[in-house]
Amino acid sequence: MVKIGLEVHVHITALKTKLFCSCPSDYTGKDPNTVTCPVCLGLPGAIPVLNENAVKYGILTALALNCQIAEKLIFDRKHYFYPDMSKNYQISQYDGPGSMAIAKDGYIKLNDKIIRIRRINIEEDPAKIVYPTGSILTSKYTLLDYNRSGTPLLEIVTEPDLRSAKEARFFLEKLRSILEHLGVCDCGIEGAMKADVNISVKGGERVEVKNVGSPKDVEDAINYEIARQRASILQGIKIERETRHWDNERRVTVPLRTKETEEDYRYFPDPDLPPYSITPELIEKFKREMPELPDQRAERFVKQYNVTPYQAQVLVNEKALADLFEEITNNYKNYAKVANLLINDYMRWLNENNITVTQSKAKANHIIELFEYLDSGLISIKIVKELLPEMILTGKTPGQLIKEKGMTNIKDENYLERIIDEVLNEEKEAVEKAKRDPKVVNYLVGMVMKKTGKRADPQMTVEIIKKKLGLT
């Protein structure tokens, strides 16, 4: 039996400043160690002051994850010695005597299964450790960038209810969608959502794999670790409790250090941060501000757009995709056609090429224009599928690409008849088969498409071939 638990660290990208100081939380493109102050550098005497908007996003997340919300918020010092934390403790939260996380005892429904949420913490992010000449294992020296130090995080801790790598990936994808719909986190930003993965195989101790970047990486790390632990158990090697690192390039886990226990961190309440009261009125206020969540949106999609429950779930799995779908369907009413294109062609190509919806340059009005060309008969569905990747990469409109490539459908009947006659003369065996089995006409249509660079109008081509073969 396999048990898997996750500790998910989510940057509250909605906040413009850090958790306990006024430094900007967005340090993208800034020189190292330039977005700092005495508080986020951990200098003696610097006093942290809570960014109250972090409480708002913590409560919204707790409500969305069906958690019990604490009456007061208490911050703790989590002590450890590591270069990324200059004051030798992290301001976090702990669910123990004298301590209190912002929320606990929640759940996410994953299909028909309940995945329990143990607790949600608000905490600060450590500094970034940079390995200039290799990886954590091979770099000749290490650099520290404190721009990240003090940026606000939510830590979402599950119970060990997950049983497979695929289930863990699905859980993270659903959690990501919830957080995006709440406006808590733009999970498309690199490093905005990471997970520590705890894995135990029957017969062995729990092993933690730290800082795994994406749901797909989590799936791969778990599969590797399960196989490694099972192989060790079969060889009579005892699985020790330890922390491992996910090597993203080699796609393996490697030992990092012996796993600490909770006692090793010596949690105690931070004397510089007084308890923060969370009143019932405050919770009710945020309940009224709750946006539509993915499950609610999926139900609406089924009713409003008559898509299948599966299609609705795929669409809302990524907020940007659901937004794109609704932007298109505001002006183009063939909902099924839009859903099919986005799920089967658009998203498949994005996933195969590691591009996100927000990175795509194909805008809603471009895709509407593409459907209009298709509906008018100027282009075929094959041309649609050829144009879509270029629209995604370049941002060019279908009209621009069609003009550049001369890709409009050929509707000149005399020209089509001439090409079809050539095909019928060259494919005499297929012609005889088509007279007995009309399905073979599709093969002849394909040969015409080949000769015309896929530009022959499909409907006209079928009609002319059938007429010439006496099948109409």
Swiss-Prot record:
Swiss-Prot/TrEMBL catalytic activity: L-glutamyl-tRNA(Gln) + L-glutamine + ATP + H2O = L-glutaminyl-tRNA(Gln) + L-glutamate + ADP + phosphate + H(+); L-aspartyl-tRNA(Asn) + L-glutamine + ATP + H2O = L-asparaginyl-tRNA(Asn) + L-glutamate + ADP + phosphate + 2 H(+)
Pfam families: GatB_N, GatB_Yqey
Function description: Allows the formation of correctly charged Asn-tRNA(Asn) or Gln-tRNA(Gln) through the transamidation of misacylated Asp-tRNA(Asn) or Glu-tRNA(Gln) in organisms which lack either or both of asparaginyl-tRNA or glutaminyl-tRNA synthetases. The reaction takes place in the presence of glutamine and ATP through an activated phospho-Asp-tRNA(Asn) or phospho-Glu-tRNA(Gln).
Taxonomic source organism: Saccharolobus solfataricus (strain ATCC 35092 / DSM 1617 / JCM 11322 / P2)
Subunit structure: Heterotrimer of A, B and C subunits.
Enzyme Commission (EC) number: 6.3.5.-
InterPro entries xref list: Asn/Gln-tRNA_amidoTrfase_suB/E (IPR017959), Asn/Gln-tRNA_Trfase_suB/E_cat (IPR006075), Asn/Gln_amidotransferase (IPR018027), Asn/Gln_tRNA_amidoTrase-B-like (IPR003789), GatB (IPR004413), GatB_C_1 (IPR042114), GatB_Yqey_C_2 (IPR023168), Gln-tRNA_amidoTrfase_suB_CS (IPR017958)
Protein name as catalogued: Aspartyl/glutamyl-tRNA(Asn/Gln) amidotransferase subunit B
SMART domains: GatB_Yqey
Gene Ontology BP terms: glutaminyl-tRNAGln biosynthesis via transamidation; translation
Enzyme class: ligase
Highest taxon above the source species: Archaea
